């Protein structure tokens, strides 16, 4: 039997939810960090400027909104993240702001940050980089790039490291990615070496922008 005290508590909770301020609502998302939720690894990082409300959903899904950020990135996937075929879908309507939707991950020894970019907004992440080759995957063409980061945040702290990129010419929000194909072509066409597998997530990233996304990822292997 439900007690009167329990009913009062439920009513108070409901009223509190309705009357919560926007700032309080922002606090309901998870804190920056990494972990496992419903069988999937997640990572959420922010440099602390602006607001990011990141929420894990069932299985490989998450939803996020951000406002006036400097830089943040987060998503769900696997750790470790060896080569695999993945499928993803969702909503990402950040075409007019600086944001990426990408399969994102890291390796160590060597320390490498990599992106397989499916969609981007107002800024092309390959701007200013030399193209090393192309990859065909799931009916689209990706251009391969390498950039270098000096004394920047990484999974081992502040460090210098290479970034490897596959940037899809035909932007999209939904499809499949054969990560092994990208990794092989990075080595073959650009002599881009990867190390020990760290995490791999289907990520949303925002830079000096506001936006939102709802994404789900799953493995096909």
Swiss-Prot record:
Keywords: Carbohydrate metabolism, Glycoprotein, Glycosidase, Hydrolase, Polysaccharide degradation, Secreted, Signal, Xylan degradation. Residues 28-218 form the GH11 domain. InterPro entries: ConA-like_dom_sf, GH11/12, GH11_AS_1, GH11_AS_2, GH11_dom, Glyco_hydro_11. Optimum pH is 7.0. GO terms for molecular function: endo-1,4-beta-xylanase activity. Its EC number is 3.2.1.8. Endo-1,4-beta-xylanase involved in the hydrolysis of xylan, a major structural heterogeneous polysaccharide found in plant biomass representing the second most abundant polysaccharide in the biosphere, after cellulose. Is an alkali-tolerant enzyme, exhibiting 50.6% of activity at pH 9.0, and 26.9% even at pH 10.0. The lineage of its organism: Eukaryota, Fungi, Dikarya, Ascomycota, Pezizomycotina. It is an enzyme of class 3 (hydrolase). GO terms for cellular component: extracellular region. The keyword Glycoprotein applies. Glycans are attached at residue 89. It comes from Humicola insolens. Optimum temperature is 60 degrees Celsius. Retains an activity of 52.5% in the presence of 5 mM SDS. SDS tolerance is important in detergent and textile solutions, and XYN11A thus might represent a potential candidate in these industries. Moreover, the alkaline-active, cellulose activity-free Xyn11A with a high specific activity is interesting for the biobleaching of paper pulp. Combining xylanase Xyn11A and xylosidases Xyl43A and/or Xyl43B leads to the release of reducing sugars as high as 1.29 folds of the sum of that released by each enzyme, which contributes to the formulation of optimised enzyme mixtures for the efficient hydrolysis of plant biomass. It catalyses: Endohydrolysis of (1->4)-beta-D-xylosidic linkages in xylans. Belongs to the glycosyl hydrolase 11 (cellulase G) family. This is Endo-1,4-beta-xylanase 11A. The keyword Cell cycle does not apply. Residues 1-17 form the signal peptide. The active site is at residues 113, 205. It is found in: Secreted.
